[in-house]
Design a protein with these regions (language model features):
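C-terminal outer-membrane/trafficking sorting elements
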Residues: 176-209
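Short, conserved sequence motifs used for protein processing/export or organelle targeting and
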Residues: 1-173
Length: 209
């Protein structure tokens, strides 16, 4: 069964829904909010940090973490999956506007394969190091490393993502303008909650003059 639009968060399985999961049909904005809140209530037993460093055309990435337990819930084959993605890629499309901005385009799988590297948390702390050559057509200023601890299993219902992290490949050089118009679909308010594609933080500004 194929359907769009659909949403999947941490590959969690929600009982009582028509769709088999881990992707579910989006009926309305309220359903999205409830689904995200449900995923947020799942406790994570592992922390994760990605540290990319660029030197010319070479990028080295260190991913480290700490597990609060030596085995994750329902673990069968624990993996650490690390990808290199690029945002703000302009491409053509068939209908609507002439161009479309693609975010999260997969540029490289830093792990041995797309399902990740075997991860041993019996010692609680762990670390993986990766290296990749930056291709000329990549814009490293728009790239980020995405890494997540997940379970792999032949059964799609047992591929839970336990925690994830991301880090820009290059440090930002300053504050940039974030579009907030409805057409850009970057910021949405559903039932009084702010939903943004790249996350958000509240900032208070005070005039102390």
């Amino acid at each position: 069964k194929t359907f769009v639009p659909a949403i999947a968060v941490d590959r969690i399985i929600v009982s009582g829904l028509e769709d088999p999961g881990p992707a579910y049909f989006i009926s309305d904005g309220e359903a999205v909010t409830k689904f995200i809140d449900l995923a947020k209530d799942v406790y994570s037993f592992v922390t994760l940090k990605a540290e990319p460093k660029v030197n010319g055309t070479q990028m080295n990435v260190k991913v480290s973490g700490h597990a609060g337990t030596n085995e994750m819930p329902l673990q069968t084959d624990l993996r650490l999956t690390t990808w290199l993605v690029e945002d703000n890629i302009t491409s053509k499309q068939q209908e609507g506007k002439d161009t479309y901005i693609q975010n999260g385009v997969l540029r490289a799988v830093l792990s041995k394969n797309a399902w990740g590297d075997a991860l041993d948390i019996s010692g609680y702390d762990f670390e993986k190091n990766y290296s990749v050559t930056i291709k000329p057509e990549w814009n490293v200023k728009n790239m980020r490393v995405v890494s997540f601890v997940n379970n792999y299993d032949m059964n799609v219902e047992r591929r839970t993502i336990y925690n994830t992290t991301q880090a820009p490949c290059m440090d930002p050089t300053g504050i940039y303008e974030q579009p907030t118009t409805a057409n850009n679909n970057i910021l949405s308010v559903v039932n009084g909650k702010i939903l943004m594609s790249k996350g958000w933080q509240l900032v208070n500004v005070y005039d102390i003059s």
